[in-house]
Amino acid sequence: MARGLKKHLKRLNAPKHWMLDKLGGAFAPKPSSGPHKSRECLPLILILRNRLKYALTYREVVSILMQRHILVDGKIHFCIRLSDVVSIPKTNENFRLLYDTKGRFRLHSIRDEESKFKLCKVRSVQFGQKGIPYINTYDGRTIRYPDPLIKANDTIKLDLETNKITDFIKFDVGNVVMVTGGRNRGRVGVIKNREKHKGSFETIHVQDATGHEFATRLGNVFTIGKGTKPWVSLPKGKGIKLTILEEAKKRQAAAQTAATA
């Protein structure tokens, strides 16, 4: 008889975008996901131990976290997800969690100016008691009295110090987006058109910087900028997914330049 949530996670059942080796042990860290889905977040132990190499064991990670040296969106948290800002005041480092073109989590280093805000996708716009309007964001935030022009699927620019909306991006054709789900996760491009299907999912057609077009669901698209310029810096590759032939040519060119050097 099951009694509540499972308290353990086998390493073979962990999400692939965590990039854990199968022979590293029997278990993987069980995320304390909070408002997020457990498969869409990344435990801080994997960041400090596996990515940044600031700790060797789980106990060392716990001692670092208990000293409150790691901030997520300016606060103490133990799990992060897409677009969250990880700050380490002791080392003056700031990171933003993004996807690479293969759908894996990428810890992208950012400057201090960029670490003061984050982009949040609007899930819904509702009215509470006494007709007070509020919006729900993808990371579980509830913000009252938003701009009346903000609608569902738009993106807001949130100041992490004041928790107030400083600007917003409409979900319109011509704006740059990042795909956060499906087989095209991590790709960045501009919205070309929207296809509405009654009784089914709305399809979004996106074109990347190289001219390749692809389609995905409306729920998998996250607007990150107005026009073709994103409001946040992107990791290496700028969200452009190469084909198998293009990757082979790139490796050959790199090998030739290394041989001639």
Swiss-Prot record:
Protein name: Small ribosomal subunit protein eS4
Family the UniProt entry places it in: Belongs to the eukaryotic ribosomal protein eS4 family.
Keyword Membrane: no
CDD domains membership: KOW_RPS4 (cd06087)
Gene Ontology biological process terms from the UniProt entry: translation
UniProt xrefs under HAMAP family: Ribosomal_eS4 (MF_00485)
PROSITE patterns on file: RIBOSOMAL_S4E (PS00528)
